[in-house]
Amino acid sequence: MAKQFIYPFTFGDKSQSDLLGGKGANIAEMVQMGLPVPPGFTITTEACREFLSSGTVPAQLTEQIHKSLSNLEKAVGKNFGDPLNPLLVSVRSGAKHSMPGMMETVLNVGITPEVAEALAQSSGNQRFAWDSYRRFIDMFGRIVCDLPDEIVHKIENSFLLKANAKVVADLPVESLKELAQQLILAIQEHTGQDFPKNPIDHLTQSIEAVFRSWNSERAQLYRRRERIPSDLGTAVNIQSMVFGNLSDDSGTGVAFTRNPATGEKGSYGDYLDKAQGEDVVAGIRNTMSLADMAKKEPIVHAELERLMKTLEDHYRDLCDIEFTVERGKLWILQTRVGKRTAEAAFRIATQLVDEGKISMDEALLRTGGDQLAQLMFPQFDLSESRNLIATGIPASPGAAVGEVVFDSKRAFDLAKNGRKVILVRRETSPDDLVGMVAAEGILTSRGGKTSHAAVVARGMGKTAVCGTESISVD
């Protein structure tokens, strides 16, 4: 009997994270709850383990991908790779245990120059179409083809300087088209092969890249630190795209049902209009708070607050939620029980007991000795006068002192020799994990409360300040 490597989002629930991964299991749970989740399917952790063991995609998996893609096309009424009515998908990792930012994601899979041109015509928005195409080429190049970040940044910076723009998404439409072509040329030079043109090849190669990312250096480092077994593998979630970069009433965000840094009640998170999801966690642009989102999009914000309460009541815990707004419609992309600081863990557990959502015994099980030790984090003596250089967002509490270091590898090398360091970056990426682990604290000039630096620092119990806009980091 053939193994089943793929399940639609309509199958399963949150208890099946061994098979579907945490993300896939929680997506299935939300579908069962009737929440607005873009349709898709999950490739199981077993498929990943077989791929990593053999080095090739199982033949049965290839057949099941084609069948599942056909079923998804029927569900959404669009066709993958068809310029007249295109279906685009995201390809995202989803291991049993949350590993924020440690594995890979490829967005806008299925887009080609022909599809981009058709999207520009049908949406009436050239920028949206070609920005989406540029984003796909960028991600495919770095993640699938191993194009070094330095090459990507060098090409992007040349366009930014020429256009006097701060971020790539602000480039003129013609520059976005030209940038995508320059990236393709760089990919071809780097790989020695022609850039694939068939969207099915884009999809299968993206899936393989996500499988491989389970064994990336940073993923292995994170697993060792968090004591996550190395033989689990990751599931892969294929989800139909909804576009936060489509229009003025579109955007993307990350929300927590309570403050993951302090445990205070009340929604907490970041929102970016005219953006795609990776922009928020990457910290490339400074975000607006959910309170500011409420002023800009009051109806959508009210719906988000309602769904946040629904999810927290259902999970009986702090929930971390990724969402996208497309032309005023709210979509929930994923949820998980959110990582939090030790202070927040104790406060939230106490609150949930007081609210009758969990028992005292369950609250004790949710708090451990490691978190108790973290509660003793140092603080500065505020009674002494200090020269304040800059202020930012208190992403993870505590106080830290050390040499300022701008490079993660150097931070690691200095810390290995017994020197205390503060890692200072414009924004952190998953590749900075080695420096973040080594540093006493983390400071970024960009990013918000849910950026990569903030989420990872909270999970590790590291002091972090993000979005210090008055500091310029070269």
Residue ranges and their predicted role:
Residues 1-387, 413, 419-422, 427-434, ...:
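Nucleotide/phosphate-binding sheet-loop regions of phosphoryl- and nucleotidyl-transfer enzymes
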Residues 397, 401, 415:
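NTP/phosphate- and nucleic-acid-binding module
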Residues 400, 404-410:
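Long, structured protein-protein interaction/assembly regions in large complexes
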Residues 401-402, 420, 442-443:
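Short, flexible loop segments at the rims of nucleotide/cofactor-binding pockets, characterized by
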Residues 445, 465-468:
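Generic beta-sheet signal
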Residues 461-462:
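Residues forming the flavin
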